[in-house]
Amino acid sequence: MKLAVHITFFYRDEKLDDRWTNAKDKFPYLRKIINEYNQYPLKVDIFIHTNKKFNLLDLKYNTYTNGKIQLIKHNLYKYSLFKGKNYYLTWASRKTIKKQRNEYDFFIYQEDDIFIPLNAFNYWQTNKQDCLKNNLNLGFLRIELKDEIEYVSDLDMKIDKLMNLDKREYVINDVNPYCAFWIYDKTELNKWIKSKFWDLKNIHGKGAIVSNKLEKIGLNNFPILRYLIYSYKNKRPDSAMEASAIGINGLNLGWYKNTVLPIKNSNVDPDCRIYHLSNYYANEYETNMGTIKFDEIIS
């Protein structure tokens, strides 16, 4: 059995006054991520997609014996006219993933500060099939730490809708299934690739790369004009990043009936936890994200 892991890593030398850390601040995240994949009980090949080449040895991870690690540099020139063009680095891995679709048994796409412990992978393997046969998505919760307390980063309200599935109780996450990564087996990935949703423009907002207005006046074949209109229609450039990391789990896509999490000891199964290593939301005060404790997520 083989797993392909695709990580988007935006390399920036300087640290600006915003939430995006520079490359050297993020190296410890990548090191922790790589060291964990080295413990997985199957071959894990890691592909790091970046805008700038760097020496992998600078990460100072343990000797990797569980597969290969490959750095792939991408040019973002085709997105030069888009607002927030750097966010579109998150789209760059799609071509490679499509080429690999029959070479691996499982696929993960993740952002560069997402830590997926082995027990979370085992949780997915154990529960995914029961969910898929009922057209449900098995959910995860992205966890952040504040004062050593675990908070759920992506939910601003508790979840409370329960359901039974094959004599087991689940809770429905109809608030926000996003957790900055996705995981699918080869069968599910190939279904996605054959669908219209493999084109991320069908997930990223309501903008269309093909403009009806340009078509009417005979200018639809000019890519610069198409890019400008698409960028204008999509007001939040960071939603390009979210479109890549949500996979086919989005609430408005209709691919699955719901995203669900199994109940264990009156709370969600603790193995559903994956970790946002930057701990950003739990330590900011501008939103309600990251304010609900993990052990209180079910109301």
Language-model segments: what does each one mean?
Residues 4-23:
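A conserved hydrophobic helix/loop-capping motif in glycosyltransferases and polysaccharide synthases
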Residues 23-44:
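Short, acidic, metal-binding catalytic loop of nucleotide-sugar glycosyltransferases
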Residues 43-53:
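Short beta-strand/loop segment that forms part of the nucleotide-sugar
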Residues 86, 117-216:
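Conserved catalytic core of nucleotide-sugar-dependent glycosyltransferases
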Residues 195-299:
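C-terminal catalytic/acceptor-binding lobe
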